[in-house]
Swiss-Prot record:
Annotated Gene Ontology cellular component terms: intracellular membrane-bounded organelle; NSL complex
Lineage: Eukaryota, Metazoa, Chordata, Craniata, Vertebrata
Phosphoserine sites (modified residues): 462
GO molecular function, one term: histone acetyltransferase binding
Name of the protein: KAT8 regulatory NSL complex subunit 1-like protein
Length: 987
């Protein structure tokens, strides 16, 4: 067992990550893994991994490992962690230099053994080579050659010195001391020979050299090469040993912390049980000091460890566990960096030696935690789906069983025999009578009473027999009775009277929701079928003897729809238990209740208490979202599936706004800050302490709030409330100073406005009858509407009446009226309409001529002016008469008009020529009559009078005649005025 587990917990320490002599305040009580790593990066070996500081008298070189693994007391024992060999070996180098200052040139050989990390081994040189060097003083040439060898080795080593330094800073220890592997024997020998040729030959060319001296130099060179190769081998062995030691120590650390966590988990299990069972208290009478001995078996050791851990973990707190976790994280990361190359940076730049910070992220915010939560959500939803599928399969199986039972319990529908025609029935009755008579003749012992009805049957079978009619009526009534009885359930099969239904309902109810079992159904079916058979036999016995079965009936086949129903077994009504009624929305089970703990992101808070408050509303929130959005399922959908606009709506509807600013509520035109107790409680829930700052509400928010108030209060209530607030505000400002801060004003206003708002609301509720929340409809207004008789019940239905249809007259059918299509009849029929058309066209031609002839128009205007100057009175009177005068005037008026104005005469002549060219269905006589207006003066006057009555809507005198002409001059003026008036109207 490791020495770290042997210490006695005399003081009841919770976690024993390292021996008791360690500096616990430096390692276990650090706040973060970064602090542990910074302590681990110290230059001295005493601060590495939180181990105890060695005594100053001890030699700390790594070759002297007498203290490693030796059994010592729990307070003073040495453990060497060679995670960083440079600091340890540098200290050994300094101590060794102080001890070996008097040694001559052996230090030069030892200086050759420096690597990129300044690692120096002590006493690795062979004893005989060291003695030889001490006995035989080296010559200048040899010493110079050794210096050159050192320079060569140093030049080969220092090529990657910077790389090694950066790698050591980044904790890549696997590359330390790796440069000497590249220096082969051939390279060393080549360098020595080159040094000898360079230094000896040019420098001592003029000096005679003896053969003995040359041999000594060669021997020294050979021994030097041998020593260098030996030291290289030893260095490689030392590196392998160091790597192996690091792996062993890493396993030791991992095993140690694994045991600590295992004991912690064992301790937490009974602690959780005691939390649910407060009666069982962990006993404190256990011994506080236990020691695990190596010679005891493993089971006993584990039991003792468990007993010791129970006493130690009994007083554990969350802070101690957190400190233990931090220290373990730091040590394990340090070990990982030393052994795993992937955990370190591969860059050799000196500027990139920054330490990668490991943030102290909360457990519920880490990526691994989120992945586990998502995995649990998907797994729980999959489990819920599997449960629903299995439930549906169970229900389908139950319904299948019910359907099978219903089909098995169905009775047979028995139909009566087909009704035969009367003639066939008479023949069958005759055959039956003959057979009966034969039977009577064959059996003379039959009593005479049986022979009496035979002659009576012949009389009764006659069509006029009343007995046959009565029998038919009885047959029909019997058939109707059978049909009614078959439709009504028998009395002994009703659930109230049957012996099967007298049993308790608990015996009939099964787990699948069926009230009647299969065996009971079969028994009941057999009993009911036997009852039906008995009834059938009794009914057959009561049937009339005249209905006899014969073989001829089997050959008759009729449709089942035409045959009456004889017997019918009423179907049973099966009811399922209420738990099996299908609902459109299945409620989740208790096992899936943990799904509702996750809220929408907009509703999540920073602390556990706030999230616990929202847990009760989670299910209602999911149900609400599923009702609004059909694509969202209350159980299967994830919280991330909630649409974005629902999040925004939730944020807008929230009364509390969480953020860096204080939570403020708006009342009317002022900001009301929450009370100190409420704000501190919200700060504790949200996990932060916001700084209160004065806020000013914008005009838009004021309008929005005012609009919301108008929805709940009437205009009168709003006016009273505004007046009350203004008076309170004036009262507050009168008693306050001008140098008050914004926050103090807000606090003062908040208290006043709260009280005033409550009182105003109570007063308005008591006084105002238009409060939307307290509208009461009296029953006197509702009761008459309920008792009122509906109108559609009084609608009268129209009745039918008899209509006498009279035939058409026969004399009118044969006669047909023949229309006369001769020209004379046609002209007489259309003469009046043609005259009206002529008058219309004359007026149209006159107005058309005035529009086209601008000269005539200008002359007419000039003439009008002259007439107005000469005859103002006459012209005015002519204008008054123009409305009543006909538009189509005779040729006399045209001649009178031409007397003063020849242009008008020309226009009239042109007009007459146009009328001659028109193609009317008129004869030559009619055309001559139209040109001669003197002969048909009366017809023209009548037509013009009728035309005026239709077009201009003028009133005609009662006598039906126009006013008489007074003079020819006046007629001329009237005609001229009529033409000017028409021209003005057309303009």
């Amino acid at each position: 067992m490791t020495p770290a587990l042997r210490e006695a917990t005399a003081k009841g320490i919770s976690f024993s990550s390292l021996p008791s002599t360690m500096e616990s305040d430096k390692m276990l009580y650090m706040e973060s893994p970064r602090t542990v790593d910074e302590k681990l990066k110290g230059d001295t070996f005493s601060q590495m991994l939180g181990f105890p500081t060695p005594e100053p008298t001890l030699n700390t070189n790594f070759v002297n490992l007498k203290h490693f693994g030796s059994p010592q007391s729990s307070k003073h024992y040495q453990t060497v962690f060679l995670m960083r060999s440079n600091s340890t070996l540098n200290k050994h180098n300094e101590n060794y230099k102080q001890k070996k200052l008097g040694e001559p040139s052996c230090n030069k050989l030892k200086n050759i053994l420096y690597n990129g990390s300044n690692i120096q081994l002590s006493k690795i040189c062979l004893s005989h080579s060291e003695e030889f060097i001490k006995k035989e003083p080296l010559s200048d040439t040899t010493s110079q050659c050794m210096k050159d060898v050192q320079i060569i080795l140093d030049s080969n080593i220092t090529k990657d010195t910077n790389v090694d330094k950066v790698q050591l800073q980044n904790c890549k220890w696997y590359q330390e001391n790796a440069l000497l592997d590249k220096v082969t024997d051939a390279e060393i020998k080549k360098g020595l020979l080159h040094c000898t040729q360079k230094k000896i030959v040019p420098g001592h060319s003029n000096v005679p050299v003896s053969s003995s001296a040359a041999e000594k130099e060669e021997e020294v060179h050979a021994r030097l090469l041998h020593c260098v190769s030996k030291q290289k081998i030893l260095l490689s062995q030392a590196r392998r040993t160091q790597k192996h030691l690091q792996m062993l120590l890493a396993k030791h650390v991992v095993k140690h912390y694994g045991q600590q966590m295992k004991l912690s988990m064992k301790h937490q299990l009974p602690k959780m049980k005691t939390f649910h069972e407060p009666t069982t208290i962990l006993g404190n009478s256990l011994p506080k000091c236990t020691e695990i001995k190596p010679e005891v078996n493993t089971l006993t050791a584990e039991n003792k460890l468990w007993d010791d851990a129970k006493n130690g973990f009994a007083r554990c707190t969350a802070a101690e566990i957190q400190r233990f976790a931090f220290s373990a994280t730091g040590l394990l990361s340090h070990v990982e960096e030393g052994l795993d190359s992937d955990a370190t940076d591969s860059s050799s730049d000196d500027d990139l030696d920054e330490y990668t910070l490991r943030k102290n992220v909360a457990v519920n915010c880490s990526t691994e935690w989120k992945w586990l939560v998502d995995r649990a959500r998907v797994g729980s939803r999959w489990t819920w789906l599997q449960a629903q599928i299995s439930d549906l399969e169970c229900k389908i199986q139950q319904l299948t069983d019910i359907h099978r039972q219903i089909r098995a319990s169905k009775g047979i529908v028995v139909l009566e025999e087909c009704q035969l025609p009367k003639d066939i029935l008479k023949k069958q009755m005759q055959f039956a009578d003959q057979a009966a008579s034969l039977n009577i003749l064959g059996n003379p012992q039959v009593p005479q009473e049986c022979q009496d009805p035979v002659p009576e049957q012949d009389f009764e079978m006659s069509p006029s027999s009343p007995t046959l009619l009565l029998r038919n009526i009885e047959k029909q009534s019997a058939q109707l009775t059978e049909i009614i009885n078959s439709l009504i359930a028998p009395l002994n099969l009703s659930p109230t009277s049957s012996p099967l239904s007298s049993k308790s309902c608990s015996h009939k109810c099964l787990a699948n929701g069926i009230y009647r079992s299969a065996s009971e159904n079969l028994d009941e079916l057999s009993s009911s079928s036997s009852w039906l058979l008995n009834q059938k036999h009794s009914k057959k016995k009561r049937k009339d003897r005249t209905r006899l079965k014969s073989s001829s009936l089997t050959f008759m086949s009729t449709s089942a729809r035409t045959r009456p129903l004889q017997s019918f077994h009423k179907r049973k009504l099966y009811r399922l238990s209420p738990t099996f009624y299908w609902t459109p929305q299945t409620l989740p089970s208790k096992e899936t209740a943990f799904l509702n703990t996750t809220q929408m992101p907009c509703l999540q808070s920073a602390s556990t208490w706030s999230s616990y408050e929202h847990n009760s509303e989670s299910y209602l929130l999911r149900e609400h979202v599923s009702e609004l959005d059909s694509s969202f399922h209350s159980v299967l959908s994830l919280p991330s599936d909630v649409p974005l606009h629902f999040h925004f709506e939730t944020l807008l509807k929230k009364t509390e706004i969480k953020g860096n600013l204080a939570e403020n509520k708006f009342v009317d035109e002022y900001i009301i800050s929450p009370s100190p107790v409420h704000s501190t409680l919200n700060q504790w829930r949200n996990g932060y302490s916001p700084i209160c700052k004065p806020q000013i509400r914008s005009e838009s928010s004021a309008q929005l709030l005012q609009g919301r108030k108008k929805r709940h209060l009437s205009e009168t209530a709003l006016g009273e409330r505004t007046k009350l607030e203004e008076s309170d505000f004036q009262h507050t400002e009168s008693g306050s100073h001008s140098n008050f801060t914004a926050v103090s004003n807000v606090n003062v206003l908040s208290r006043i406005q709260n009280s005033s708002r409550n009182t105003a609301r109570r007063r308005l509720r008591s006084e105002s009858s238009y409060d939307i929340d307290n509208i009461v409809i009296p029953m006197s207004l509702v009761a008459p509407a309920k008792l009122e008789k509906l109108q559609y019940k009084e609608i009268l239905t129209p009745s039918w009446r008899m209509v006498v249809l009279q035939p058409l007259d026969e004399y009118n059918l044969g006669k047909e009226e023949i229309e006369d299509l001769s020209d004379e009849v046609f002209s007489l029929r259309h003469k009046k309409y043609e005259e009206r058309e002529q008058a219309r066209w004359s007026l149209w031609e006159q107005s058309k001529w005035h529009r086209r002839n601008s000269r005539a128009y200008s002359k007419n205007v000039e003439g009008q002016d002259l007439l107005l100057k000469e005859y103002p009175n006459n012209f005015s009177s002519s204008q008054q008469c123009a409305a009543a005068s006909p538009p189509g005037l005779p040729s006399e008026n045209q001649d009178l008009c031409a007397y003063g104005l020849p242009s008008l005469n020309q226009s009239q002549e042109t007009k007459s020529l146009w009328w001659e060219r028109r193609a009317f269905p008129l004869k030559g006589e009619d055309m001559a009559a139209l040109l001669c207006q003197d002969e048909k003066k009366d017809q023209v006057e009548r037509s013009s009078t009728a035309f005026h009555g239709e077009i201009f809507g003028t009133s005609v005198p009662e006598n039906g005649h126009h006013p008489k002409k007074q003079s020819d001059g006046m007629e001329e003026y009237k005609t001229f005025g009529l033409g000017l008036t028409n021209v003005k109207k057309n303009r």
